[in-house]
Amino acid sequence: MKALVRVAVTGAAGQIGYSLLFRIAAGEMFGKDRPVILQMLELPDEKAQAALKGVMMELEDCAFPLLAGMVVTDNPDIAFKDADAALLVGSRPRGPGMERKDLLMENAKIFTAQGAALNKVARRDVKVLVVGNPANTNAYIAMKSAPDLNPKHFTAMLRLDHNRALSQLSTKLGKPVANIEKLIVWGNHSPTMYPDYRFATADGTPIIEAINDQAWNANSFIPTVSKRGAAIIEARGLSSAASAANAAIDHMRDWLLGSNGKWITMGVPSDGSYGIPEGMIFGFPVTTTNGEYSIVKDLPIDTFSKTYIDKTLAELEEERASITHLLR
């Protein structure tokens, strides 16, 4: 058996948390030879804590061989103590009549506190994935609130958008998703993100040779991927939970265990690539090895793509400007 890993999960009794925890305990995130301790955080109210206790009871009843221990708490300092990985799933959802800027403010308070707690008690090499929306800006806030930790280790989840785009291409081409490579989702995890298959291949053949149809790209593919979350809410009455948890597993597994040369999409702090301001958490194509990621460099950006990338960048800059005064 490999060394034990401590995983903190916030919003642990929520829908995504419930879909996520059992799969982590089964070894799907860190490997089937890595015991885990789940450190679960929920809100400090009676109902949330009772629900979290119920989740813990169910985890116990699964008798997972890899589950070496559990912590349930409403205190971030306890949840993040010595964490090797932190999945920040819990966030304030948008309520009726709530403006986007109000949502940003409410979440800024949450992620400032969580970033500070990580800075105080987590392992110095902790790897952080923000799932709670608005994920990119929440990740930026947490990163800025943890000055003693490696900023490169704060990431946002765009893997759900990536997987949604993969599925749409698979359906269009009649090819298995496993045979499609080099897909990218640029930008913000929001309806402005830009799924880009200009470099993608299916069975090694460029997809743009099979789908040479800019109208389908602009009028069907991009809108379907960008509005998929809303379509699921409309159909199900609830937001994506199992698919979001699955994407979180994919993101962390590939980051920690390596993508084997394949391109994946991660929201990571920009190093200035593609004209994206340094430090902004932005969806890029990356490859991963030995627990570190590298942005795929020097891809040509055509006029069509630049329009979309500029739009998602403008949204992120606006979000960042609205919360900068709250950061230290």
From Swiss-Prot:
Entry binding sites for NAD(+): 11-17, 107, 114, 131-133
Keywords: NAD, Oxidoreductase, Tricarboxylic acid cycle
Reactions performed catalytically: (S)-malate + NAD(+) = oxaloacetate + NADH + H(+)
Positions annotated to bind substrate: 94, 100, 133, 164
UniProt-listed InterPro entries: L-lactate/malate_DH, Lactate/malate_DH_C, Lactate/malate_DH_N, Lactate_DH/Glyco_Ohase_4_C, Malate_DH_type2, NAD(P)-bd_dom_sf
Enzyme class: oxidoreductase
Catalytic residues as annotated in Swiss-Prot or TrEMBL: 189
UniProt entry tagged with the keyword Zinc: no
Molecular function GO terms recorded: L-malate dehydrogenase (NAD+) activity
EC number, as in UniProt: 1.1.1.37
Presence of keyword Oxidoreductase: yes
GO biological process: malate metabolic process; tricarboxylic acid cycle
Alphabetized HAMAP family for the sequence: Malate_dehydrog_2
Similarity comment text for this entry: Belongs to the LDH/MDH superfamily. MDH type 2 family.
Function according to Swiss-Prot or TrEMBL: Catalyzes the reversible oxidation of malate to oxaloacetate.
Name of the protein this chain belongs to: Malate dehydrogenase
Organism: Xylella fastidiosa (strain Temecula1 / ATCC 700964)
